[in-house]
A protein has these predicted regions:
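Short, proline-enriched alpha-helix->beta-strand connector loops that line the catalytic pocket
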Residues: 88-93, 119-122
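A short beta-to-alpha transition loop/helix N-cap that caps and shapes the active-site region
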Residues: 1, 77-82, 103, 135-136
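Short beta-strand/loop motif that positions the catalytic acidic residue
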Residues: 94-97, 101
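Serine-hydrolase catalytic machinery in alpha/beta-hydrolase-like enzymes
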Residues: 1-39
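Cofactor-binding loop segments of dinucleotide-utilizing enzymes, especially the Rossmann-like FAD-
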Residues: 75, 98, 130
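C-terminal catalytic histidine-bearing segment of alpha/beta-hydrolase fold enzymes
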Residues: 110-152
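Primarily recognizes the serine-hydrolase "nucleophile elbow" in alpha/beta-hydrolase
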Residues: 42-89
């Protein structure tokens, strides 16, 4: 499949560097879309699966202005210290993870929840039973209901 950055390399400095390059590209793309369509962050929901979740969390929380919300599936925070140092807002976040995920360990859901709580960011988390590294219908329903509440 497609990936934003290479997670096969286990050097944390390399991973963070590659991640930040991808983050800059995504931020630039979002800025272009916001300018073209005259839309503000508070009207945008950032969402992603796996690395897309990781990107959504970082881009969402390091933006000058908060987004409507972040919805992440089966991801993690790439570097807790980096995000803590660069966080600029308190965008509400929903994180969903499968308990049988063998690609991105479900322990990362707990690490992310701890980070959000320590940073006083509203976070809702769901650990889906008997779920590997994919998005089941249950997760989609949870996410849809969350987004519908946020965009009203």
């Amino acid at each position: 499949g497609y990936q934003w950055f290479d997670l096969e390399n286990d050097n944390p400095n390399y991973i963070l560097d590659e991640f930040l390059k991808a983050e800059r590209k995504l931020t630039q793309f979002l800025d272009e879309v916001k300018n073209e369509y005259k839309v503000d962050n508070n009207k945008i929901v950032l969402s992603g699966f796996s690395q897309g979740c990781m990107m959504s969390i970082n881009v969402g929380l390091t933006s000058e202005k908060p987004f409507n919300c972040i919805v992440g599936f089966s991801g993690k925070i790439i570097n807790l210290d980096d995000l803590k140092n660069r966080r600029k807002n308190f965008t509400d976040t929903l994180l969903i993870h499968g308990d049988l995920d063998d690609i991105v360990s479900p322990t990362h859901l707990l690490e992310a929840k701890d980070f959000f709580l320590r940073e006083n960011i509203n976070v809702e988390t769901h650990l889906i039973k008997n779920c590997g590294h994919h998005i089941p219908i249950e997760s989609s329903s949870i996410a849809l209901n969350y987004i519908l509440k946020k965009i009203k």
